[in-house]
A protein has these predicted regions:
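A mature extracytoplasmic/lumenal domain signature
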Residues: 75, 122, 152-154, 213, ...
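N-terminal targeting signals for export/organelle localization
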Residues: 2-96
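A short beta-strand-turn-helix
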Residues: 98-116, 140-141
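Domain-level signature for proteins that mediate thiol-based redox and metal-cofactor handling
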Residues: 31-32, 119, 147, 242
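C-terminal cap of thioredoxin/glutaredoxin-like
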Residues: 2-7, 39-56, 60, 200-273
Length: 273
C-alpha cells in the first residue's frame, strides 16, 4: 500500500480531525500554541487560522513519521465497512428468504426435501464455478439430507444463457444435476449447442428439451433469478448462501466451509431460512 492519496485526502479532513481531537481531549493550547498576548486559548473558545495551521502541521508531521497509523486506520475502516456489508446482507437475505429457500421452481441437486438448503448463484462459463462443481458434488454424495438450489445467473452473455436454458429444461426430464455437472466439467466454452450435445449423451428427449428451453416459463425463471441477484447485491459468480451466511467465490476449502455452515444450521436452527 502507498500513501499517494495522503496530500489530497488527508488535507481535506486533517483540519477538522485536528480540531476534533483537540477539543475532545479538552486541552488548552499550552503545548506551545497561544493566543494574543501569550494567553492560552481554551479549546472551547475556538482556534485562529494560524493555530489551526499549527495543529495541522503537528498532526501531519506525526503521521508522516508514523505512517503505520494509516494502516491501522484503514484496518478499522475495513472492519466497519465489512460489518455494515454483513448487516445489509443479512437484511437482504431475510427479506428474500422465501425466494431463496422455499422456491420450488428452481432446479436442485440432492434431497428434494432436505433439512438444510445450500443456494448457489452461478454461470456456466464462469471459471470459478467450474472449480466449485466437484466440492458441490462431494457434498451431495456425502450428505444425503442436503438440498442444493441452483440459481442459473448467466452474466457472461448469450452463450451462458443458452446453456442455462438447456440445463433448466433438462430438469423437466429429471436430469438437471447430471447436465449441470457435465457442463461445468466440460472443456471449452459452454453454449446452447454444447449443452444439447451433452444432453443427447445423457439420453434426453432433445425435441422436448428445445421446447422447454425456450418456453415462457424458463424465460421468467431467468428474469426472476436476475432480479433476485440484484436484490441481494450479487453481481458475480459463484456465490453460495446457507441460511444467513454467504461465501463469495470458490475458496479451496469450499466443501469444509459449506459442511460447517450446514452443521451449524442443524445444531442451532435457521435464522432466516
Amino acid at each position: 500500500m502507498t500513501f499517494e492519496f495522503f496530500p489530497i485526502a488527508l488535507k481535506r479532513s486533517l483540519r477538522a480531525a485536528a480540531l476534533a481531537l483537540a477539543i475532545g481531549a479538552g486541552f488548552a493550547l499550552s503545548v506551545g500554541l497561544s493566543g494574543p498576548g501569550g494567553k492560552a486559548v481554551a479549546a472551547n473558545d475556538g482556534f485562529s487560522d494560524g493555530q489551526k495551521d499549527q495543529i495541522e502541521s503537528i498532526i501531519k508531521a506525526y503521521l508522516l513519521k508514523n505512517p503505520e497509523l494509516m494502516l491501522e486506520v484503514q484496518r478499522v475502516l475495513d472492519q466497519k465497512q465489512e460489518a455494515a456489508r454483513q448487516e445489509a446482507s443479512g437484511k437482504a437475505l431475510a427479506a428474500n428468504a422465501a425466494s431463496l429457500f422455499k422456491n420450488t421452481s428452481m432446479p436442485y441437486g440432492g434431497d428434494q426435501k432436505g433439512d438444510v438448503t445450500v443456494v448457489e448463484f452461478f454461470d456456466y462459463n464462469c471459471i470459478h464455478c467450474r472449480d466449485a462443481v466437484e466440492p458441490i458434488g462431494k457434498l451431495i454424495d456425502a450428505d444425503k439430507k442436503v438440498h442444493v438450489t441452483f440459481v442459473d445467473f448467466p452474466i457472461f452473455g448469450k452463450d451462458s444463457e443458452g446453456a442455462a436454458r438447456v440445463a433448466i429444461a433438462a430438469g423437466k426430464q429429471g436430469k438437471y444435476w447430471e447436465l449441470h455437472r457435465d457442463l461445468l466439467l466440460h472443456k471449452g466454452s459452454n453454449c446452447e449447442d454444447a449443452a444439447d450435445k451433452l444432453a443427447d449423451k445423457l439420453g434426453l428427449d432433445i425435441a422436448k428439451l428445445k421446447m422447454d428451453a425456450n418456453s415462457p416459463e424458463t424465460t421468467k425463471l431467468l428474469k426472476d433469478n436476475s432480479a433476485l441477484a440484484g436484490k441481494l447485491g450479487i453481481n458475480g459468480t459463484p456465490h453460495f448462501i446457507v441460511d444467513n451466511k454467504v461465501i463469495p467465490g470458490a475458496p479451496e476449502d469450499l466443501y469444509d466451509q459449506l459442511a460447517s455452515m450446514i452443521g451449524d444450521v442443524r445444531k442451532n436452527g435457521c435464522k432466516v431460512c
